[in-house]
Regions:
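Surface-exposed repetitive/solenoidal architectures
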Residues: 1-233
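C-terminal outer-membrane/trafficking sorting elements
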Residues: 234-282
C-alpha cells in the first residue's frame, strides 16, 4: 500500500486485526512493508503482522511501514511486528524502515517488535533511520537485531535527538533494559501500562503469551504486591465500615495516587484500625 509516486496519506484503522502468512521475497526491491511508502498525514493504527509472515528485500523495509517521505506528521499507533525482516542493504526495522531524508515527523506509540531484524547499516529493532524529530512512546522490542555498522548500542531505533518515553528492549541499553523473565512474567506488560491496571493498552495471558500483546481478548496484568497475576482475590468492602467497626480513612490507586472514592480496578484502602486492603471494583 503506497508507492514513491503515490505515497499513502490516509488513515488506516486495522481494528486490532492480525495479518497472517504474508510473504514478500524480493531482494531487488525497496520500500517494502505492509505499507510501502507513506507521507505526511498518514495514520496507521491497530494492526499486527504475525510471526507466520516474512519479508526479504533489498533495503528500506519493515513489517508495518517501509518508508516515510516528504513533510508532515506520520503516526503509527497500536501496531506490532512479529515477522522476521531481512534486507541485503540498509534501513530495516520492525515498525519503520526509514524516514527518507528525515523530512517527516514520525510518532510511534504503543507498538512492539518481536521479529528478528537482519540488515546492514542504519537498521534497528523498532525503526531504521528515524531522523531527528521522532518520538517513540510506550513501545518495546524483544527481537534479535543483527545489523552491521551499528552506531554503538543503537539496537532499538536509529536517529538523532529522538525522544523515547517509557520504552523497553530485551537486554539492550538504548532504552530501559528488561530481562526475559520480566517479559514473560507480566512485569513488562505492567510497566507498559504505566504501572496500573485500570486503563490498559497491552494485555498478556500469563502462562500462554510469551510477551505483551495488543489484543483485548487477552487478560489484564495486575500486581498483587509480590507478583504479577491475571486475577486478584481482594477483600470486599460493602460499606465504609466493616464488621469490626473500622472505617475507611484513605483510598489510593496502585500507583499511589490518592482518591476520594473507590474507582474501577484495584484500589488500596486504609482502615481506621491500621489495616490496608486491596479492593477490586469491576
Amino acid at each position: 500500500i503506497g508507492t514513491v509516486d503515490y505515497p499513502y496519506a490516509g488513515v488506516f484503522e486495522g481494528n486490532g486485526h492480525r495479518i497472517l502468512n504474508l510473504t514478500i521475497d524480493n531482494d531487488a526491491a525497496g520500500n517494502i512493508g505492509l505499507f510501502g511508502v507513506v507521507t505526511g498525514g498518514a495514520k496507521i493504527r491497530n494492526v499486527v503482522l504475525d510471526a507466520s509472515s516474512y519479508i526479504y528485500a533489498k533495503a528500506w523495509a519493515a513489517g508495518i511501514v517501509g518508508t516515510t517521505k516528504n513533510d508532515g506528521l506520520v503516526e503509527i499507533t497500536g501496531c506490532g511486528n512479529e515477522a522476521d525482516i531481512t534486507v541485503t542493504g540498509a534501513n530495516a526495522g520492525g515498525i519503520l524502515g526509514v524516514n527518507d531524508q528525515q523530512t517527516a515527523m514520525v510518532y510511534i506509540t504503543n507498538c512492539y517488535n518481536t521479529g528478528a531484524i537482519t540488515a546492514q547499516r542504519e537498521s534497528a529493532a523498532i525503526s531504521g533511520w528515524l531522523g531527528n524529530r521522532a518520538k517513540v512512546v510506550n513501545t518495546y522490542n524483544t527481537g534479535i537485531v543483527a545489523a552491521t555498522g551499528l552506531d554503538g548500542n543503537l539496537t532499538f531505533a536509529r536517529g538523532t535527538n529522538c525522544e523515547y518515553i517509557n520504552c523497553y528492549e530485551l537486554d539492550g541499553s538504548q532504552v530501559t533494559a528488561v530481562t526475559s523473565n520480566q517479559v514473560t512474567d507480566g512485569e513488562l506488560c505492567y510497566l507498559l501500562n504505566g504501572k496500573q491496571s485500570d486503563d490498559v493498552v497491552f494485555f498478556q495471558t500469563l502462562g500462554e503469551d510469551s510477551h505483551p500483546v495488543l489484543d483485548k481478548t487477552h487478560k489484564v496484568v495486575y500486581f498483587d504486591g509480590t507478583k504479577y497475576v491475571n486475577e486478584l482475590l481482594p477483600d470486599a468492602i460493602e460499606s465504609t465500615t466493616d464488621t469490626t467497626g473500622a472505617t475507611v480513612t484513605g483510598i489510593w490507586s496502585l500507583s499511589g495516587m490518592k482518591q476520594n472514592t473507590l474507582q474501577k480496578g484495584i484500589n488500596v484502602v486504609k482502615m481506621s484500625d491500621g489495616t490496608v486492603r486491596k479492593v477490586l471494583v469491576k
